[in-house]
């Protein structure tokens, strides 16, 4: 076993054992922020050839304007892979209770998949924008072209399938949004689908403060609703919803059970439609 492997396993033990490690680290005094103003976070609990290859593809696409990070959900069976040395930002289930507020339910799924981003933001809050991309998202085109398409889009929250209550009144997660003393009528709530999204520094700060204030809920209703209520600007990658810009209708994804972006069923691979986001890809 090499010295680096020993170091990684030691880190893994500290993470799982509760000692202070990378997942709870804060910026060191005097550390200079990255000159790039955007962070691109690739979120995964899986480490294999396909996942690493996709992370590399995205990293190459954003290298001129963003700093990539591999957000790894570390568990006892997480494999060591030296190819990710120095690029992993690890976290464990313990972050769900480590930020002075708790999740809607005591697990990342369902509905708390934004907690790794909130944890990262608490550590590295100097970026202006944050992209979050789940490991099973693919783009059937040039990732660089995709990111460049939104460089000038001034939105605090850029995601997919944004809809109002009237668009899908029977959606099961509307009632999950709650607060001990405050109430937002379901008719004024928004939903979104967030396997990939971009969010501003100010919006993340507001979400953190909202959680500390007592708001909880599935993040697909919590994020868009609380941001719109506070006057933040929302935008959609494509699709057919009322918040989609006319020139982006169905441009980067299609909706529905037969669409390119959906909760299920799984796609075996990205395609055959060109320049579209696909989720979920489960040939892993």
Which residues fall in each region the model found?
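Conserved catalytic core of nucleotide-sugar-dependent glycosyltransferases
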Residues: 139-225
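A conserved hydrophobic helix/loop-capping motif in glycosyltransferases and polysaccharide synthases
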Residues: 38-47
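C-terminal catalytic/acceptor-binding lobe
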Residues: 210-284
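Membrane-proximal basic amphipathic "stem/tether" segments
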Residues: 1-34, 284
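Short beta-strand-to-loop acidic/aromatic patch adjacent to the donor-nucleotide binding site
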Residues: 127-136
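Short, well-formed alpha-helical segments that are part of the catalytic scaffolds
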Residues: 47-62
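Short, charged/polar "capping" segments at the starts of alpha-helices
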Residues: 48-52, 76-81, 168
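Active-site-proximal specificity loops/subdomain of glycosyltransferases
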Residues: 74-126
């Amino acid at each position: 076993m090499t010295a680096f492997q020993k170091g990684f396993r030691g880190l893994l033990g500290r993470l799982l054992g509760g000692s202070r490690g990378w997942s709870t680290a804060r910026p060191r005094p005097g550390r200079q922020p990255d000159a790039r103003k955007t962070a691109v976070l690739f979120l995964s609990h899986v480490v294999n050839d396909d996942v690493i290859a996709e992370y590399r593809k995205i990293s190459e696409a954003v290298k001129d304007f963003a700093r990539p990070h591999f957000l790894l959900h570390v568990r006892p069976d997480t494999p060591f892979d030296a190819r990710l040395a120095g690029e992993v930002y690890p976290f464990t289930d313990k972050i769900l209770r480590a930020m002075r507020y708790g999740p809607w339910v005591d697990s990342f799924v369902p509905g708390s998949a934004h907690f790794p981003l909130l944890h990262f933001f608490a550590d590295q809050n100097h970026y202006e924008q944050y992209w979050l991309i789940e490991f099973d998202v693919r783009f059937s085109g040039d990732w660089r072209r995709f990111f460049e398409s939104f460089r000038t889009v001034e939105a605090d929250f850029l995601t997919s399938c944004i809809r109002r209550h009237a668009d899908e009144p029977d959606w099961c997660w509307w009632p999950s949004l709650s607060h001990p003393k405050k109430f937002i009528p379901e008719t004024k709530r928004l939903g979104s689908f967030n396997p990939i999204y971009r969010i501003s520094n100010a919006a993340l700060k507001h979400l953190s403060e909202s959680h500390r204030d007592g708001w909880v809920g599935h993040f697909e209703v919590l994020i868009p609703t609380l941001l719109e209520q506070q006057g933040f600007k929302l935008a959609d990658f494509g699709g057919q919803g009322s918040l989609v810009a006319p020139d982006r209708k169905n441009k980067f994804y299609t909706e529905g059970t037969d669409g390119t972006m959906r909760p299920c069923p799984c796609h075996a691979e990205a395609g055959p439609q060109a320049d579209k986001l696909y989720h979920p890809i489960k040939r892993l």
